[in-house]
């Protein structure tokens, strides 16, 4: 039961493969086996949102999933947002509107906001507040983050 298993998945558009114990968390697999350290480990209980990734296009907590559950899946981590060295429009908006301070929540916040904008391309401020409430930020007070999501919305339509 503890024999390593092969996990094959697509991460940030590239086919990836790794061997890991069957009970290894997806967040640890991403960080330790695939060297994608942008996904942060916060509470390890699915509460803080720092470990949020896109799993088959939808926001998901990677600390609540086993790596084997991602076999055959398509994942996007914060490292996958840039294209040819250029920041994603949402990342640009976060920079322009001071949507980060310490940066610990930023990867999870970006991917949560990206999923929100996929589902609701024209969110109200209340929609944004509700959508990002799944990610805890202890530094910004959320004002810059909300402004950044508002600014990014028309760029992504």
Predicted regions and their residues:
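Signature of N-terminal electron-transfer/Fe-S-associated modules in redox systems
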Residues: 1-157
């Amino acid at each position: 039961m503890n024999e390593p298993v092969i996990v094959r998945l697509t991460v940030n558009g590239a086919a990836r493969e790794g061997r890991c114990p069957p009970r290894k968390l997806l967040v640890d697999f991403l960080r330790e086996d695939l060297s994608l350290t942008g996904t942060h480990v916060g509470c390890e209980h699915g509460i803080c949102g720092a470990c949020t990734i896109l799993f088959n296009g939808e926001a998901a907590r990677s600390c609540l999933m086993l790596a084997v559950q991602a076999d055959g899946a398509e994942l996007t981590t914060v490292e996958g947002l840039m294209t040819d060295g250029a920041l994603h429009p949402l990342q640009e908006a976060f920079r322009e509107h001071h949507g980060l301070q310490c940066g610990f929540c930023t990867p999870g916040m970006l991917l949560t906001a990206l999923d929100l904008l996929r589902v609701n391309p024209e969110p109200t401020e209340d929609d944004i507040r509700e959508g990002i409430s799944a990610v805890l930020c202890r530094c910004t007070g959320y004002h810059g983050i909300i402004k950044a999501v508002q600014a990014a919305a028309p760029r992504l339509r």
